Amino acid sequence: MIVGTGAAGLFAALNLPRDRKVLIITKKDAESSDSFLAQGGICVLKDESDYESYFEDTMRAGHYENRKESVDIMIRSSREIIRELIGYGVKFERKDSGREQDAPEAQKKTEKQQSEGHENFLDDYAFTREGAHSKPRILFHEDVTGKEITSKLLAQVRSLENVCIMEYTTMTDIIVAGTDGQTGEDGMQCAGIIAEDAQGNVLKIHAPYTILASGGIGGLYEHSTNYPHLTGDALRIAEKHGIRLEHLDYVQIHPTTLYSRKPGRRFLISESVRGEGAILLDKNGKRFTDELQPRDVVTAAIREQMKKDGTDHVWLSMERIDKDTILNHFPNIYEHCLEEGYDVTKEWIPVVPAQHYFMGGIWVDSDSQTSMEHLFAAGETSCNGVHGANRLASNSLLESLVFAKRAAQKIEAELDAGGEAEQLDETA
């Protein structure tokens, strides 16, 4: 049982045994996950010489409150994850002529390089840089990297005969079962979920293992870049059952969303824009901060400047970025701003901080196992400690994929060992 059709939920499904039936539910349509909204890119360890720098950048951004083991696992796993994404048809920008690498060519080249002893299959790819990164290490697809990755994963999952996706189905509780009292929270383990479909029918779905990958908490905020239906349902249910939670106060505010008086989800202006040279300006057109500091630092600087200026926003100028880069790297941002009346190639745009990401969540170990047996969590729903108190830009997709795969691998290992949930004395 998987709850959520974002990157974590889909990648978990792809890594579970094909001889097991897998049911995925999602609160809205399958495409309405925050993973689809991710703009900037996905980090990767370019080569071994970048390890220390990447590790330090992640730790520093997280105020050194990160779980070091988790950071190491994520970084060490990144190259394998990227290889798998390319194999699934994900296209990342290449150096030559801004052309993206298609899957067959990438796979063929990767195999050839490996057979010849070359370890770095990433040499032909273009990398961008974002705030708090000491060097470029972010792969990207225009300014819709999340959509590119997640749509390809969703297509792969939909092709699997052993997986069924139920849309417009909301988890309302988990099923817990008593054991011999030796494992889990007070001898209880997860045995499935309770859900409600679009017609209001209550569904009791039994499963030996459950993965919670239902996203973050942005729907609880008035101003957020998240979809409004992401309201932390899994956290509420976990708390009800005494499942361990961690760092619920670790909420990231993104420095730059397009200012608007309209209600609803805020449109993100990717950090990659600042990585490529955009600068922040006060009401007088004066630059007031280093745009490539960690997100919480830049957010604080913007809020302080807004207070000084007595304004509801500051300005972002892309004048230092050439027009071709804007049109090729940031076409979605360019088009959206045009729709809102701003031509970013000719004028500044108003930006304001908004809630963006949840670093806390349901506590999990390095295999994404929660404190309740047979219950796993991955993606923004979970807290494995990678991000510490503040997430480094473009680590979210990578973290979701790495630890979703580890959850699937752990479940497969337990199934191979004969582990099935005992459905005794069920409660909900």
Range-by-range predicted roles:
Residues 209-263, 267, 395-406:
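Glycine-rich loop(s) and the adjacent beta-strand/alpha-helix scaffold that form part
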Residues 199-209, 370-374:
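Core beta-strand elements of the Rossmann-like FAD/NAD(P) dinucleotide-binding domain
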Residues 43-74:
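Glycine-rich active-site loop/strand segments that organize a redox cofactor
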Residues 86-201, 213, 257-260, 280:
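Conserved redox-cofactor binding core of oxidoreductases
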Residues 17-42:
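Glycine-rich FAD pyrophosphate-binding loop
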Residues 1-24:
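N-terminal Rossmann-like FAD-binding beta1-loop-alpha1 element of flavoenzymes
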Residues 244-259, 383-395, 405-428:
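Active-site-proximal substrate-binding core of FAD-dependent oxidoreductases
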Residues 30, 237, 243-349, 410, ...:
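An anion/pyrophosphate-binding glycine-rich loop and adjacent beta-alpha core
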